Amino acid sequence: MNETNVGLDFRTLNSRLTIEADWYYRLTQNAVIDAPLPMGAGNLLGNRGEILNTGVELSFNWADKIGKDFSYYIGANLTTLHNEVKDLNGLSYLYGGSAEFRTISQVGGELNAYYGYDIEGVYQNAAEIAADPIAVANGLEPGDFKYVDQNKDGKIDNKDRVTLGSYIPNFNYGINLGFSYKNFDFSMVMQGVAGNQIVNRKRGDRRWHSELNYDLDQFENRWTGEGSTNEYMSAKGSVKPWNISNFNSFYVEDGSYFRIQNVQVAYTFPKKDFGKFKMPSI
């Protein structure tokens, strides 16, 4: 592990305001990768990769009092992450995931990025089908997906697959706040991520499990005729191999979220004096 951290801590206004900033650089050498053996003898896990993670960590905290009974605080933090494959034992890429939900690690790209076909829309009418040699060659109909022919060779095959996103967030962030008033205390922690993608496995698993229902969004917004949608396939198309047998961008969704992680409300009962017995505060 080759790691460098540079940080700065700053306090001002009688320490009511605290700011921390850190830059980190972590190059994991001898990372475990599943690399192929010579002569097609399968794969073998080994410490032969290099993975870089770098970014900044920022935090801001403010704490103060108003009068003698009320105190409060608020804080926020942000972490950025750049993930990059630097070396794969001399290889330019390695496949991962499963045959159905393929991932790829490429030198210069992110680790285990989603890898499949990019959808640019839905065929809307017969004229559009007739004008597209790819649609004609594959017997497509209105309501079927239109894949991007990445290399412009007039067909859709493995050479048209591209990275469709990564499960690794570019940003992690959080907010915490609270206050105390006499015997009452309140605190809240919120947290979120952004810049990552997730795979909707339920949509993908319908390829093998026809008893699974559509999700509500897909059902309500399915293609029902020209101009109805350019994002969802038709009901008929949802069982056609062209649309569902290849891992594509339809299964990849935004993984960003923001949530309230914890809320706490407390009351501290004051001490009570019962003669010789004194009950502590609770």
Label each region the model flagged.
Residues 1-40, 79, 83, 143:
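Membrane-embedded beta-barrel scaffold of Gram-negative outer-membrane proteins
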Residues 1-18, 44-67, 107-116, 166-171:
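Outer-membrane beta-barrel signature, preferentially recognizing the C-terminal barrel domain
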Residues 6-10, 21, 58-62, 175-181, ...:
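Residues on the lipid-exposed face of transmembrane beta-strands in outer-membrane beta-barrel proteins
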Residues 15-17, 68-74, 171, 182-184, ...:
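Outer-envelope beta-barrel architecture signal
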Residues 23-29, 62-64, 78-84, 181-183, ...:
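Transmembrane beta-strands of outer-membrane beta-barrel pores
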Residues 35-42, 89-99, 203-212:
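Flexible, surface-exposed loop regions and adjacent strand-edge segments
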Residues 46-49, 63-166:
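Conserved small-residue
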Residues 193-282:
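Extracytoplasmic gating/loop element in the C-terminal half of outer-membrane beta-barrel translocons
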